Amino acid sequence: MSNAILQYSLYLIILVLLAIPLGKYIGKVMNEEKVFLSKLILPCENFIYKVLGINEEDMDWKKYSFSVLAFSAVGFIFLFALNLLQGVLPLNPEGISGSSWDLSFNTTASFITNTNWQAYSGESQLSYLTQMLGLTVQNFLSAGVGIAVLFALIRGFTRVNKSGLGNFWRDLTRIVLYLLVPLSIVLSILLVSQGTVQNFKPYEEVALLEEIVLDDGNRVTSQIVPQGPAASQVAIKQLGTNGGGFFGVNSAHPLENPTAFSNLLEMLSILLIPAALCFTFGRNIKDKRQGRAIFIAMFTLLIIALCIIGVSEANGTPQLAQNGDVNLGYIDQSGGNMEGKESRFGVVGSSTWAAFTTAASNGSVNSMHDSFTPIGGMVTMLLMQLGEVVFGGVGCGLYGMIAFAIITVFIAGLMVGRTPEYLGKKIEPYEMKMAMLICLATPISILIGSALASINPEILNSLTNSGAHGFSEILYAYSSAGGNNGSAFAGLGANTVFINVSIGLIMLFVRFVPMIATLAIAGSLVKKKKVATSVGTLPTHNLLFIGLLIFVVLLVGALSFFPALALGPIAEFLQMIA
């Protein structure tokens, strides 16, 4: 147990030590200040502005929103066509045919929205061109869009009596050039050094060391080893909280995540930028205490989730504990729940990844969440159901938590009978309506989607498990879509018209509705003047506010999802211990 605590602590300490300086760097990128990469990248940046005709025009929130939607729509059309037509396009050594219309729609919606839900297996259903030119490019762009919207919101707090929130095209260009590309290059090289594949070779057939005899008597003497440009996609899928694996089993695949060191790199990359953005927020609003307060709230929720998942998976189930074949060589010490986990990562590496990937809207996996204990699986589900605000996706996680902060100061204002304020700006009914829209988009979409799927005979027949766990598989799928996460309980037959279309629509809804509402809040705040701090102003940087913020986040999650969780993982847990 002490070794496990040491590992958990080490992961978290490294994360904090990396996030603080990166947050300062991102703040400089946002403000177009000089950074150490400026001499190298500035000529490329200016060339892009010149070729595309991008100027320094300040956009109001409506124009910024239109730019976000128009850019995403163009990306949607391109990626949808690429999925349909990949069979007649180059860089397809395996001759993989185009995807069906519904799978193409689902995949396109998934990657445009930074969700990366995968109803396909990459090595058998997508060509190198689609993976590289389609999915990898969208991993960069969708992450950049989320961070750009956060930048606009920060400007809404810092600017006074204005209407402009910055220029979307300049924000997006700088985020990709100065942040996402450099980090991805470094991580890609490190992953290749560990054995992650990066090539354009055809798949290779290799002889097995020991042949396999099937039940029907046939003998298998060889296997197909997939190839491809995986490392470059894996790097940005982690850094951009995208999560879609190059291979079907994601980062549980030995060619995508070969070693314990690659596992550490990929795992830290999940939360690196979301955590750093908290410090960017504090720096750029010129009050670092505010950024630290939000970081501590997120970090506290992450630690609670990590502890519950870790203890649950380490203890296993009563059935495993009674089985003398699963132990670590010590008397009466269970080996934990190793079902669905890679032995090279173990319970600690798998539990940490599960907490990180569902706290962020990443969704990549190095173990199968469907095989987690009921409580461990429930916590991963709840992290998504909270709206992906425990760090969450790059950009969108922080602006989601800021929406909760606005609700928190409003509730506190009602308690003391004062007009609520946040960061020197008055919070009025318009901001509250938009904040509630941000916070309610996720639970509404999850619950409606899960309810419709639960009464669909086609979906029920596709489940590999019945009863409480079968319902959990449905609830997890729609929680993943509603949280823009992308991970799954794998027992659900995902590649059906109903699942592809319904989940695709939910992903689009929960991505763009909160995004536009966030820009609307920014557009309202930027026009307001700063309010002087008074005796009655609620401090939003102390432990009291942090506690209130955590309480509000958990309250919304508990009230919204407890009935559904009671029918799924909680019922399964009670059945298990009965």
Swiss-Prot record:
Keywords: Cell membrane, Ion transport, Membrane, Potassium, Potassium transport, Transmembrane, Transmembrane helix, Transport. The chain crosses the membrane at residues 3-23, 65-85, 134-154, 175-195, 261-281, 293-313, 397-417, 435-455, 503-523, 543-563. It is found in: Cell membrane. It is a multi-pass membrane protein. InterPro entries: KdpA (IPR004623). GO terms for molecular function: P-type potassium transmembrane transporter activity; potassium ion binding. Pfam families: KdpA. One of its GO terms (cellular component) is plasma membrane. The keyword S-adenosyl-L-methionine does not apply. PANTHER family: POTASSIUM-TRANSPORTING ATPASE A CHAIN, POTASSIUM-TRANSPORTING ATPASE POTASSIUM-BINDING SUBUNIT. Belongs to the KdpA family. Part of the high-affinity ATP-driven potassium transport (or Kdp) system, which catalyzes the hydrolysis of ATP coupled with the electrogenic transport of potassium into the cytoplasm. This subunit binds the extracellular potassium ions and delivers the ions to the membrane domain of KdpB through an intramembrane tunnel. The system is composed of three essential subunits: KdpA, KdpB and KdpC. This is Potassium-transporting ATPase potassium-binding subunit. The gene is kdpA.
